[in-house]
Amino acid sequence: SIKNEFWNQIVKRKIENSIRVLEMTSKEEFPISKLTEYINEITDGDSKNREGLAAKMYFRSLFGSDFIRFYDDNVNAALNYGYTIIASAIIRNLAVYGLNTYLGIHHSSKINNFKTLNLRYTIFKIFVDPFLKIT
């Protein structure tokens, strides 16, 4: 379906950006080659959850093998802060052009009013993550 193909492209870009960050910040070849494999394994609508596996490998390669996203620690707080800055800029621009931020694919939630944003800002996380690795 068009929806699944669109989602596949988003997942592919997210993983490609993760590879770029790791290339800038790490000398380890294994995570980069594994993320490249995940791109080639993306199926219709990412039914094999390559996005999730790639994210886990990416964050652990970047911040250490014990790192868990969304824990209550300084790194996660800094990531959330950086992502919020990007998200607010994108929300403003979407609203200016009259786009509906309530629409989304695969990331649905009754409490998340910005589903479209989840599709867009995760692709731009490349602008936040490397700075936390460096500092």
Region locations from a protein language model:
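Active-site helix-to-loop segments that bind/position phosphate- or nucleotide-bearing substrates
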Residues: 1-135
